[in-house]
Curated annotation (Swiss-Prot):
Pathway: Aromatic compound metabolism; phenylpropanoid biosynthesis. The active site is at residue 161. GO terms for biological process: circadian rhythm; green leaf volatile biosynthetic process; lignin biosynthetic process; phenylpropanoid biosynthetic process. InterPro entries: Epimerase_deHydtase (IPR001509), NAD(P)-bd_dom_sf (IPR036291), NAD(P)_dehydrat-like (IPR050425). Involved in the latter stages of lignin biosynthesis. Catalyzes one of the last steps of monolignol biosynthesis, the conversion of cinnamoyl-CoAs into their corresponding cinnamaldehydes. Mediates the conversion of feruloyl CoA to coniferylaldehyde. Also active toward p-coumaroyl-CoA and sinapoyl-CoA. Involved in the production of floral volatile phenylpropanoids in flowers of fragrant cultivars (e.g. cv. Mitchell and cv. V26) from cinnamic acid, a common precursor with the anthocyanin biosynthesis pathway involved in flower pigmentation. It comes from Petunia hybrida. It is an enzyme of class 1 (oxidoreductase). One of its GO terms (cellular component) is cytoplasm. Induction: Circadian-regulation with peak levels occurring in flowers during the light period, in the afternoon. Optimum pH is 6. The gene is CCR1. NADP(+) binds at residues 13-19, 38, 44, 64-65, 84-86, 157, 161, 184-187, 199. This is Cinnamoyl-CoA reductase 1.
């Protein structure tokens, strides 16, 4: 492996929530980065150009996942590829085919460029969606979502991520590409980009009053900085292989709103569950041991949620209360 300072890596979908942090940390570590975006001149990618080291070592390449030639040009000459780009939608036509074809195109372009490794950003959606799994089963890298269940419930995002990951494994095996996959859960944390992405919107709606109640359901969370660091760890660790579940905690939505209301009592955070007739859903068990074994230390979920809200305030997506002192944070693990 060449020294980091000599390495050129490609990050697809560089303007995204996870990818922006990935680009930031790669630049800080001394990598030269090629980031693919649909339009390098779009103001929404301006935050990337402002990153430390961007002027010297970041190139934004115009590319589309469905345009093989554009990907080929971006990846040619790279040592590694981080494939984070993906549609985020429950429209089957916009999700499934672009995710699968785009992933195959990236793997093929990586094979042609003879890159050292591809790190593919999959999702918990490719792992968790299985109604027949025993509640006591520990969710880990051996688990896969049930495709029929995803289709029948019209959960096209999870279905698309699952079939895209399967396509990545098949294509990588056929083309001889060293592929490692990361499966993050719902990603929270500070925003680098100017827009609010879908995962952070999940928290924002609890603070703006648009959500009057919280669901009787559970959600797994992880900090965006940890996800970015995990990508780099999987790229830099020669013995890394297979899939890696990236999760810090599983919380009931009631626990989430309780944490938020303690930190930010000035916001109209819901206090009632939308479903009081059924028993409270219990958090599922999961294992993040594979990433811990590589040395990743996870940010506690309370700290992550606090930093998410502070970022939403700083970016102007959430009004900042004026008549309140800053809370003293005592974050318990």
């Amino acid at each position: 492996m060449r020294s980091v300072s000599g390495q050129v890596v490609c990050v697809t979908g560089a303007g995204g929530f996870i990818a922006s942090w990935l680009v930031k940390i790669l630049l800080e570590k001394g990598y030269t980065v090629r980031g693919t975006v649909r339009n390098p001149d779009d103001p929404k990618n301006g935050h990337l150009r402002e990153l430390e080291g961007a002027k010297e070592r970041l190139t934004l390449c115009k590319a589309d996942l469905l345009d093989y030639q554009s990907l080929r040009e971006a990846i040619n000459g790279c040592d590694g590829v981080f494939h984070t780009a993906s549609p985020v939608t429950d429209d089957p036509e916009q999700m499934v085919e672009p995710a699968v074809i785009g992933t195959k195109n990236v793997i093929n372009a990586a094979a042609e460029a003879n890159v050292r490794r591809v790190v593919f950003t999959s999702s918990i959606g490719a792992v968790y969606m299985d109604p027949n799994r025993d509640p006591e089963t520990v969710v880990d890298e051996t688990c896969w979502s049930d495709p029929d269940f995803c289709k029948n419930t019209k959960n096209w995002y999870c279905y698309g991520k699952m079939v895209a990951e399967q396509a990545a494994w098949e294509e990588a095996k056929e083309k001889g590409v060293d592929l490692v996959v990361i499966n993050p859960v719902l990603v929270q944390g500070p925003l680098l980009q100017t827009t609010v992405n879908a995962s952070v919107l999940h928290i924002l709606k609890y603070l703006t009053g648009s959500a009057k109640t919280y669901a009787n359901s559970v959600q797994a969370y992880v900090d965006v900085k940890d996800v970015a660091l995990a990508h780099i760890l999987l790229y830099e660790t020669p013995e890394a292989s297979g899939r890696y579940l990236c999760a810090e905690s599983v919380l009931h939505r009631g626990d989430v709103v309780e944490i938020l209301s303690k930190f930010f009592p000035e916001y109209p955070i819901p206090t009632k569950c939308s479903d009081v007739t059924k028993p409270r859903v219990k958090p599922y068990k999961f294992s993040n041991q594979k990433l811990k074994d590589l040395g990743l230390e996870f940010t506690p979920v309370k700290q992550c949620l606090y930093e998410t809200v502070k970022s939403l305030q700083e970016k102007g997506h959430l009004p900042i209360p004026t008549q309140k002192d800053e809370p003293i944070i005592r974050i318990q693990p």
